[in-house]
Amino acid sequence: FLERPHIETTVWVNQQELGMQNSLCVPHVYDLTAATTPGKTYLITIRIDNRIKEINVGPDSHSITDQTQGNWNGIVGRIELQATPKVHLEDIQVYPDLSNQKALVRMNIRSASSTKGEITLSAASFNTDIQHKVAPVHQSFNIRPGDNPVEMELPMGKEFLTWDEFSPALYKLTAKLTNGKQTDTQQVQFGMRDFKIEGKWFYVNGRKTMLRGTVENCDFPLTGYAPMDVASWERVFRICRNYGLNHMRFHSFCPPEAAFIAADLVGFYLQPEGPSWPNHGPRLGNGQPIDKYLMDETIALTKEYGNYASYCMLACGNEPSGRWVAWVSKFVDYWKVVYTQEPPLETAGNGNLTMSIM
């Protein structure tokens, strides 16, 4: 698990290459299972390559530009070896449904063999004076080897707490998989939040809301990269709140997970973006690799951070040039389909996402 590499990583176990990843928005995660055996010693080699290759996000993109963080080389944040049971949960996505007083939970069970067991879901608030515990629900499973999608509903009850800038109540969802004598427990942070457009107004949980925002350009000159800890981002958002703001746009970059955690706690609406300003060099919609890369990146960051209540808006990037109108139209159409389905088709925990084309 490599939380924030910059840019491209290639991983080897001894002499066996496991692959390459180049996301600027989400962690690079490599599965070492097939290349390792318990009880043996291995050499893990990671190569970081920050050269701009065929995928060119643009020299002024704030994900790489020398004007802000710079095109540094390395990994910041967590670097971990993570062990999981042979039967385990992954990709847990929570979709709050305020009108029906429930949350839809989708997840995947990964298993090396056919097996059966039970999943238990529960939730409890954790950051407010008023405490609310959700009664657990159970569901049995009988699965095959590989990936097994599972969907469950978690009734929240009439007294559930909502999240917004005034009262940012949060829940910890606990998902416990029981398989014989083995268990796997995962926790996910989420908020009961609804963010919609009606006419020309934004509404948060039915309340008409004015967004009073600022732009964040990855301006951290003392380090050259965005903070990876929650406390630093809490400080940023609380300073913004002291100036009467409630919203932050991240210009042509996506902040790390710590920013979403902090914004959840403070009560701040966030708009991450695809990591590109496809104007000075690359062009959007001209068939260049940036077309697919931006689509892949926005899907990946929504999957990675979509459970956080503060993630409310998304833009593909900043001020494109080229045949961008047709490309952006398809981009918007894709996300409209994703977020107008009931339940949503794609992973983005809170199920309400406003598109912004910068």
Explain the meaning of each model-derived region.
Residues 237-238, 247-358:
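Substrate-binding/catalytic cleft of secreted carbohydrate-active enzymes
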Residues 83-114:
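Surface beta-strand/loop "capping" patches
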Residues 36-41, 54-55, 156-170:
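Short glycine/proline/serine/threonine-rich loop/turn segments at secondary-structure transition edges
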Residues 26-30, 146-152:
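Short strand-edge motifs at loop-to-beta-strand transitions and within beta-strands
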Residues 13, 102-141, 150:
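Beta-strand-rich binding/interaction modules
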Residues 15, 79, 171, 206, ...:
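Conserved, mostly hydrophobic/aromatic
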Residues 1-88, 112-113, 249, 254-257, ...:
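Accessory beta-strand-rich segments of carbohydrate-active enzymes
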Residues 174-240:
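N-terminal carbohydrate-binding accessory modules
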